[in-house]
Amino acid sequence: MTVTVNGLDQLKKLAGSDLGSSDWIEVTQDRIDTFADATGDHQWIHVDPDLAAAGPFGAPIAHGYLTLSLFIPLFTELLDVQGVSTKVNYGLNKVRFPSPVKVGSRIRLVARLVEVEDVAGGAQIVVDGTIEIEGGTKPAAVLQSLSRFYA
């Protein structure tokens, strides 16, 4: 369920709130191949299903940075900040990839809005995010995201 706020004052009131979980999305071989083409990372563990099946993970796996890049579309399912002119990614802290995402797996984001602080012309949010793998015992990614919203 999406939490919608209008303006920075309403956003500030959400500090410390759990934002819940996104819907599950499937990580397909096509998505992995497209990411490989975009980044030039064609390592066999990602793009060669036959070799990867015999490799350490038993199947192709998503690039860690592909998993990380999915934070944004998953996060937009959780928080919609309206009444601002600009929304930008500011950075990341503490990114880890505890478990690989095998092709065909489904992932989702669980997020908490840790902090909202004033910055010149707007506000910066700090979000703790965990990208879970359906049926997995360890998350695919654990991160802290920084975003800015300008009035």
Model-identified regions with their sequence ranges:
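A generic structural signal for short beta-strands and their flanking turns/coil linkers
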Residues: 21-23, 31, 41, 84-93, ...
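Catalytic strand-loop segment that frames the active site of acyl-thioester-processing enzymes
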Residues: 2-62
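Generic structural detector for well-ordered beta-strands
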Residues: 24-26, 96, 146-148
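A solvent-exposed, acidic/Ser-Thr-rich amphipathic alpha-helical stretch
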Residues: 65-67
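Hydrophobic beta-strand-centered segment that forms part of the acyl-chain substrate-binding groove
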Residues: 55-59, 72-110
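HotDog/MaoC-like acyl-thioester-processing domains
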Residues: 1-14, 100-151
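Internal, well-ordered alpha-helical scaffold/interface segments
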Residues: 33, 69-73
